[in-house]
Amino acid sequence: MKFDGVILYGPPASGKDTVTAELCKLSSAYAYFEKLKAGEGRTTGYRMVTEESLADLRQRGLIVHEVARYGATYAVDSLGLNKLFEQGRIPIVHMGQVAGVEFLRRHNARWLDVLLWCSKDVTEKRARQRGSSDVKERLAVWDATLADLGTLAEPQFTMSIRTDVLGPSTVAVLIHSAMARK
């Protein structure tokens, strides 16, 4: 099967950003999908919008999935995804909830869904190394991600990769190889 996009699912600090950067080094066709974000916190890597703009998109049926976390609302919008597809790009979408993966699968594309996983200890270490000020909250989200996976009746991911065992460049090569298969 040929895939149109990549979903990277996993707990905080499981390597989604690092693996995305490595994929983009492998091919200029890959493009990190910047989610819409309304609220406080980090702005890099997001398309910042107001709550009113988000409500308008929601009302018009243009939000594929959204979640409230870390004092903000994050959303995947069909306009942003379609723009990347129209440009011939391969979107890489980061997800932290199984429901988001399922909603994205319903969008008009074939997705390579990848579970990136690392231990809770590694999540804590990585979060501290990158200077996260909300490490306790991120560890709680790690627990929530594990619980979220426990709700699945059967495995849902095409690939599952331990990022505390394999380095980011190796992980990217594995994903890129799967994308290249027809």
Roles of regions detected by a PLM:
Residues 25-34:
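Post-Walker A helix-loop "phosphate-sensing" segment adjacent to the P-loop in P-loop NTPases
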Residues 16-17:
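Walker A/P-loop
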Residues 101, 129-174, 178-181:
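Small-molecule kinase domains that catalyze NTP-dependent phosphoryl transfer to phosphate-bearing small molecules
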Residues 37-91, 96-97:
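ATP-dependent small-molecule kinase phosphotransfer cores
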Residues 8:
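Hydrophobic anchor at the beta1->P-loop junction of P-loop NTPases
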